[in-house]
């Protein structure tokens, strides 16, 4: 009560913040008459003047008012669009590094030009990030005209662009692109071997469009660059064949947690089935030797019992393609991680693709926190304001609309069964269509949209075939005649190519558009249709002249007439066929109607069999409806139901927030290590010589050998002299009389260290002299970078396994996160030690052949990009696509020859970047990865010389 009383007197925090912007808005408006008088050249010259003022010590804040006035006037002249006062406020919010919540149709794309231009003046580059390539291209071409007018350059980063073009785009003042492309470029840059090959130039300021979709919905989706691993398709197919033979009592499914588990009976049954199918099981199924089989069984169970075709994925052209649960779009190239995608391929009897090994990864949460300043725009952020504040330190500012919202949001209608709900939706569509009201019907999956489409067809409606030329002509003809066309369009993952076109025309009178979730987000639905899109399509074959001008004028007049008819019919009608887990997604759907003061309405139709209702306690509601005497095809409509649903959604949102927060805590551990590795890597590439580092590494290896074989304060008789001799021979490639030295009277540990260091330095100096100083310095850098990359990949895999294991330690009253932090730190220390040893061992054997064989580029194997869920249980998508191997290969280098003291040599081409982890190394080809390393170090082979494979 006190809070509401205080708000009445002082206003809310949002209102107070908005009020603080008003004086600047007034100052910008005061400059407008003066700016109107400027010639185009004088207006464009403002950019040079602003940059000179920055160089003289002024801040960007000092330039905000004149810079915003300049952009507003440039947009008016170039685009014919003038920023409203509320849009100026939105630009100020973005400049301050906050999230501007702006309703659909309020011109977020135009708002971004204000903060983008101002921050681009600093010359550090501004990244404008969108959710797909179409929007990146559209916005860059559309708003790029304003920037070009003002003397700024723009670049576009989309899929398929080569490194040269990427580097030019990043060098521009303003760079447009998708979140995936920016993130992958960061990872790719940190796998390059020369600074000149890197394309990004830092992370100064980013504006993220649809910020909730990218920073919240995709927060659990790390970007991963991977390489191929062993082919296990036969095992997937074998396990898949036994899945249908499981009985209901063999497993449990938890839809809330999106998890499946075998029961005790199921464990015994599956073991019998696997043995009968010929799968080799050592002892009991759950013994350590069978961990891979158990993992594949669990993934096959999830594939069969949790994931549904045409809801979670579709099969297209012999491939399993994931469907984005938030947008309903197909995501070609994305793959589920942890073997789940392979399990789905086996289930659908398509070719099982090999699993992949992670080479580099980062989550969106940690990528976007690289920016010195981050801002975002969306129509729905308030429900996630706490998460934006806690994770990204971003405030959410609710920007008022330019005109009042006239949309009527009606209470939900709840039916007992899905069939009753479907019939009610069709009746509602027929009633609205009879008065020519345009409709957008939102569904949660392809399956649901196609069920509704079939129901529509059974009532005499016909689906528009967008493969036909001029597919919407019949719809336009019906709108002219003011008679229902009985046509409807379906927009789901199967028809994503026509997405923007279908959505843009959803505001034509009588149009019925069925869309999965928020497909088409980013494209405005204007009442009457999209005039620019129609002109572009219908005038494409006309040459400039009177005929084209007449056609243009006729289309514009018709769209104005259609708009008037749509308004008279009540504006756009949003029909929701199911509530989403997140209120934000529901609000996004509602927000498609009522743009720029247009009328509109929205209503959700629900049934007790809907996922949200079924999972979150519809049993009590069903018994209550029975007591109330609810009959078939009757609905209950009450604000109490809306509130109950909202509470259920809040619970889900809170749970998802906790999951994302927990993931971030673990990922922060890896992120700290990633930053160290990437920073060190860049420093190595920047230095002309790593001589000092190599010397330190060699000294470190000597210290490690002494510590390993000479116990502290022990007499020489207790030293492992033979082990030390073998270790020195392996790690430093010198054979020394260490056993004899140890027998000398009065020799100490320090004496031994000094002799080893001197011998190692002299041997390496002789090798440098033979190979040449310049060549050696170059080879040193390449070998260090290769060794670091390989060990980092192994480290990522180890951390992933560690993360899966530490969760069980909570049962022993130990904090899993602290356990993870502690062991991850120890593993990182081991990585540094392994880097020293691997680099020193290779460099002590290197001989350079100066005539490389023709065609040798030193690289084999492909790499793939992946974005996928953290941990195997979340089942999120990963993004995978073939990459050019040359982008990662170090510059061509002659084959390296490794020799030992006996004089024998072996020529070795540059190690392949994507070699299998299990490929044997050199003379240790028959050593098991978990056996002691033959070098005598006492370590397991995989952590010693096995790390060099």
Curated annotation (Swiss-Prot):
GO cellular component terms, A-Z: cell envelope Sec protein transport complex; cytosol; plasma membrane
Molecular function terms, GO-annotated: ATP binding; metal ion binding; protein-exporting ATPase activity
Record InterPro entries: Helicase_ATP-bd, P-loop_NTPase, SEC_C_motif, SecA, SecA_CS, SecA_DEAD, SecA_motor_DEAD, SecA_preprotein_X-link_dom
E.C. designation(s): 7.4.2.8
Subcellular location: Cell inner membrane; Cytoplasm
GO BP: intracellular protein transmembrane transport; protein import; protein targeting; protein transport by the Sec complex
Binding site for ATP: 87, 105-109, 524
Top-level EC class: translocase
Stored PANTHER family: CHLOROPLAST PROTEIN-TRANSPORTING ATPASE, SECA INNER MEMBRANE COMPONENT OF SEC PROTEIN SECRETION SYSTEM
Annotated function: Part of the Sec protein translocase complex. Interacts with the SecYEG preprotein conducting channel. Has a central role in coupling the hydrolysis of ATP to the transfer of proteins into and across the cell membrane, serving both as a receptor for the preprotein-SecB complex and as an ATP-driven molecular motor driving the stepwise translocation of polypeptide chains across the membrane.
Quaternary structure, from the entry: Monomer and homodimer. Part of the essential Sec protein translocation apparatus which comprises SecA, SecYEG and auxiliary proteins SecDF-YajC and YidC.
Record family assignment: Belongs to the SecA family.
Protein name in UniProt: Protein translocase subunit SecA
Native organism: Methylocella silvestris (strain DSM 15510 / CIP 108128 / LMG 27833 / NCIMB 13906 / BL2)
């Amino acid at each position: 009560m006190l809070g509401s009383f205080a708000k009445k007197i002082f206003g809310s925090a949002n209102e107070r913040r908005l009020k603080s912007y008003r004086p600047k808005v007034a100052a910008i408006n005061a400059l407008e008459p003066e700016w109107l008088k400027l010639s185009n050249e004088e207006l464009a010259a403002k950019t040079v003047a602003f940059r000179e003022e920055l160089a003289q010590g002024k801040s960007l804040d000092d330039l905000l008012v004149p810079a915003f006035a300049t952009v507003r006037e440039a947009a008016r002249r170039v685009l014919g669009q003038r920023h409203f006062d509320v849009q100026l406020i939105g630009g100020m919010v973005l400049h301050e590094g906050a999230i501007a919540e702006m309703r659909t149709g309020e011109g977020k794309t135009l708002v971004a030009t204000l903060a983008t231009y101002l921050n681009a003046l600093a010359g550090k580059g501004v990244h404008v990030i969108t959710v797909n390539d179409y929007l990146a291209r559209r916005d860059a071409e559309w708003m790029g005209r304003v920037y070009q007018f003002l003397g700024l350059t723009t670049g576009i980063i989309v899929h398929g662009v080569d490194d040269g073009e990427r580097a030019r785009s990043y060098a521009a003042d303003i760079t447009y692109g998708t979140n995936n492309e920016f993130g992958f470029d960061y990872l790719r840059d940190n796998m390059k071997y020369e600074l000149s090959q890197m394309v990004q130039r830092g992370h100064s300021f980013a504006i993220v469009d649809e910020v909730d979709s990218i920073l919240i919905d995709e927060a659990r989706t790390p970007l991963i660059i991977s390489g191929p691993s062993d082919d296990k398709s036969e095992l997937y197919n074998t396990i898949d064949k036994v899945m249908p033979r499981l009985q209901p009592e063999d497993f449990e499914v938890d839809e809330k947690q999106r998890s499946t588990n075998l029961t005790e009976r199921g464990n015994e049954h599956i073991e019998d089935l696997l043995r009968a199918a010929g799968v080799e099981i050592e002892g009991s199924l759950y013994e350590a030797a069978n961990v891979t089989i158990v993992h594949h069984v669990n993934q096959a169970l999830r594939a069969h019992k949790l994931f549904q075709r045409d809801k979670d994925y579709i099969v297209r052209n012999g491939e399993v393609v994931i469907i984005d649960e938030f947008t309903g779009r197909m995501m070609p190239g994305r793959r589920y991680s942890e073997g789940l995608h392979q399990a789905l391929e086996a289930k659908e009897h398509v070719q099982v693709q090999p699993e992949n090994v992670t080479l580099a990864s980062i989550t969106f949460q940690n990528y976007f926190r690289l920016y010195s300043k981050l801002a975002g725009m969306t129509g729905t952020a308030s429900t996630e304001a706490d998460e934006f504040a806690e994770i990204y330190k971003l405030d959410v500012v609710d920007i008022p609309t330019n005109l009042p919202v006239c949309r009527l949001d009606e209470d939900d209608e709840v039916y007992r069964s899905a069939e009753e709900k479907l019939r009610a939706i069709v009746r509602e569509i027929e009633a609205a269509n009879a008065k020519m009201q345009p409709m957008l019907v939102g569904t949660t999956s392809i399956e649901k949209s196609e069920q509704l489409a079939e129901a529509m067809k059974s009532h005499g409606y016909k689906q528009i075939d967008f493969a036909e030329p001029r597919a919407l002509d019949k719809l336009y003809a019906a709108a002219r005649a003011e008679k229902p066309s009985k046509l409807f369009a379906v927009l789901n993952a199967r028809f994503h190519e026509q997405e923007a076109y279908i959505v843009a025309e959803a505001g034509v009178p009588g149009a019925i558009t069925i869309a999965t979730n928020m497909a088409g987000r980013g494209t405005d639905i204007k009442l009457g249709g999209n005039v620019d899109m129609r002109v572009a399509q219908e005038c494409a074959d006309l040459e400039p002249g009177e005929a084209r001008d007449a056609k243009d004028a006729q289309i514009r007049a018709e769209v104005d007439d259609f708009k008037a008819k749509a308004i008279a019919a009540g504006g756009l009608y949003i029909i929701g066929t199911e509530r989403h887990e997140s209120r934000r997604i529901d609000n996004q759907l509602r927000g498609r109607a009522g743009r720029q003061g247009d009328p509109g309405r929205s209503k959700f139709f629900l049934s007790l069999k809907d996922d949200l209702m079924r999972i979150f306690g519809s049993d009590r509601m069903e018994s209550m409806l029975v007591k109330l005497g609810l009959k078939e095809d009757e609905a209950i409509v009450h604000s109490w139901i809306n509130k109950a649903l909202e509470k259920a959604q809040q619970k889900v949102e809170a749970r998802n927030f906790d999951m994302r927060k927990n993931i971030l805590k673990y990922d922060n551990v890896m992120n700290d290590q990633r930053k160290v590795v990437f920073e060190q890597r860049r420093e190595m590439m920047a230095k002309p010589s790593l001589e000092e580092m190599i010397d330190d590494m060699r000294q470190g290896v000597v210290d490690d050998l002494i510590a390993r074989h000479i116990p502290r304060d022990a007499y020489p008789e207790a030293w492992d002299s033979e082990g030390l001799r073998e270790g020195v021979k392996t790690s430093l490639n010198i054979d020394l009389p260490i056993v004899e030295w140890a027998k000398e009277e009065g020799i100490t540990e320090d004496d031994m260290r000094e002799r080893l260091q001197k011998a190692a330095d002299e041997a390496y100096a002789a090798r440098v002299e033979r190979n040449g100083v310049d060549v050696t310095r170059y080879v040193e850098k390449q070998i260090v970078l290769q060794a670091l990359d390989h060990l980092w990949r192994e480290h990522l895999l180890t951390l992933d396994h560690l993360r899966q294991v530490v969760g069980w330690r909570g049962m022993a009253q130990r904090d899993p996160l602290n356990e993870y932090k502690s062991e991850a730190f120890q593993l990182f220390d081991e990585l540094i030690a392994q880097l020293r040893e691997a680099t020193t061992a290779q460099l002590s054997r290197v001989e350079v052949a100066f005539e490389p064989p023709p065609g040798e580029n030193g690289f084999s194997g492909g790499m793939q990009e992946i974005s996928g869920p953290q941990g195997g249980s979340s089942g999120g998508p990963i993004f995978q696509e073939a990459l050019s191997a040359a982008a990662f290969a170090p510059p061509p280098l002659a084959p390296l020859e490794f020799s030992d003291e006996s004089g024998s040599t072996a020529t070795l081409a540059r190690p392949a970047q994507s070699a299998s982890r299990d490929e044997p190394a050199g003379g240790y080809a028959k050593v098991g990865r978990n056996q002691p390393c033959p070098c005598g170090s006492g370590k397991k082979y995989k952590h010693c010389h096995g790390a060099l494979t």
